[in-house]
Design a protein with these regions (language model features):
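Ferredoxin-reductase
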Residues: 4-104, 108, 158-161, 171, ...
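Ligand-binding loop in jelly-roll beta-barrel domains
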Residues: 75-78, 118-122, 147, 352-361
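C-terminal accessory/binding modules appended to enzymatic or scaffolding proteins
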Residues: 271-311
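Iron-sulfur (Fe-S) cluster-binding segments and ferredoxin-like electron-carrier domains
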Residues: 285, 298-307, 316-363
């Protein structure tokens, strides 16, 4: 089925490519996996690392909508994204209920840093809840296929058996790799044979599961994806077990709470604007921007090609490096601590603090 009708021509913005849907696989009642066909001349552009995501773009009723969806296929395969329907969600309802093979969708190249190194002899711990399995599945399949001595421990939480995404794919991975994949399913609204596997993946449950069934100290890296509360609980539990925080990585799809408000000094004293230079695709543009707006929102009025998706500090699409001046980042659920220390920010959450600021999207 074709995309919703638009009342304005779709602008040709650099970074997006029209890809055909190769397959739509029903995973459960409210979720699908959408595979994209990639033309030969774009295969290098859409080569991805496990754990990355694609940003999809749709124009409807004169407005532009963007959503990011994690890739679930292993490295080297066609890009496939997992999508769960969100009530009232324009994009997810369209993808889950209407999209069919042959449809064309605007897609930006893979992005994201929630990606492991495919090194031999490593043990990766994965904790996912609900649709958070999507990038985790790509990571698990890729690291297991990369070397015969890699291992994966995966804790996967869901409400009920019929809400589990990628049931067959996980079973196939277990059959293919046997003891190298330690797979633990936990259900919150359906009793399991062993009580330890019944309940939500909160701090109490995670502490119980990890303490009883996993050699936490043997795991080299941990990868967390799911609701904010689950990932925060997992970080707390893992660091409580002595895991180095730098070895714990997390990915979020959305955050319900609004970002904190910034309390600015009197603009008559401190200045109401900054000279901001943005660098993207080798081109620099300097503009006078209000300090009351994020760098992304203000700069987009001049540079419409700036990358973005969620604008909520979650996906990381708008990541850039501050090479001059200072900004205040309201919140960050996408960048690792090391990235922030190196000067990277989410421009959708960052407001200028100094008279001059330079942000480099190419870094």
């Amino acid at each position: 089925m074709a995309a919703p009708q638009t009342d304005l021509p779709v602008p040709r913005t650099s970074g997006f490519h029209l890809l055909r849907v190769a397959d739509v696989e029903r995973l459960c009642a409210d979720a699908v996996a959408v595979t994209f066909d990639v033309p030969t001349d774009l295969q290098d552009v859409f080569a991805f690392r496990p754990g990355q995501y694609l940003t999809l773009r749709l124009h409807r009723d004169g407005t532009e909508e963007r959503r990011s969806y994690s890739i679930c296929s292993p490295a080297g395969a066609l890009p496939k994204v997992g999508v769960r329907r969100v009530d009232g969600g324009l994009f997810s309802e369209w993808l889950v209920d209407r999209v069919a093979p042959g449809d064309a969708i605007e897609v930006a190249p893979p992005a994201g840093s929630f990606t492991p190194e495919l090194e031999p002899g490593t043990h990766h711990g994965l904790v996912a809840a609900g649709s958070g399995i999507t990038p985790v599945l790509s990571i698990a399949a890729s690291v297991l296929a990369a070397h015969p001595d890699t291992r994966v421990t995966l804790l996967y939480g869901n409400r009920r058996t019929d809400t589990v995404m990628f049931t067959e794919e996980l079973a196939d991975l277990k059959n293919a790799h046997g003891p190298r994949l330690h797979l633990l399913h936990v259900l919150s609204r359906e009793p399991m044979e062993a009580e330890i596997f019944t309940g939500r993946l909160d701090a109490v449950k995670l502490r119980l599961l990890l303490g009883a069934l996993v050699d936490v100290g043997d795991v080299d890296h941990w990868w967390l994806c799911g609701p904010l509360g689950m990932t925060e609980a997992a970080v707390e539990v893992l660091t409580g077990f002595g895991v180095d925080r730098r070895r714990v990585h997390r990915e979020l799809f959305y955050v319900d709470e609004p970002p904190p408000e910034l309390h600015r000094p009197d603009p008559a004293i401190e200045g109401a604007t900054s000279e901001v230079t943005v660098v993207l695709n080798g081109r620099s543009t300097t503009m006078t921007l209000p300090r009351a707006e994020s760098v992304l929102d203000a700069a987009q009025k001049v540079r419409a090609d700036l990358p973005f998706a969620c604008k909520g500090g979650v996906c990381g699409t708008c990541r850039a490096k501050v090479t001059d001046g200072e900004v205040t980042m309201r919140r960050n659920f996408a960048l690792e601590d090391e990235e922030v220390e190196a000067g990277f920010v989410l421009t959708c959450q960052s407001r200028p603090d100094t008279d001059a600021v330079t942000v480099d999207y190419d870094s």
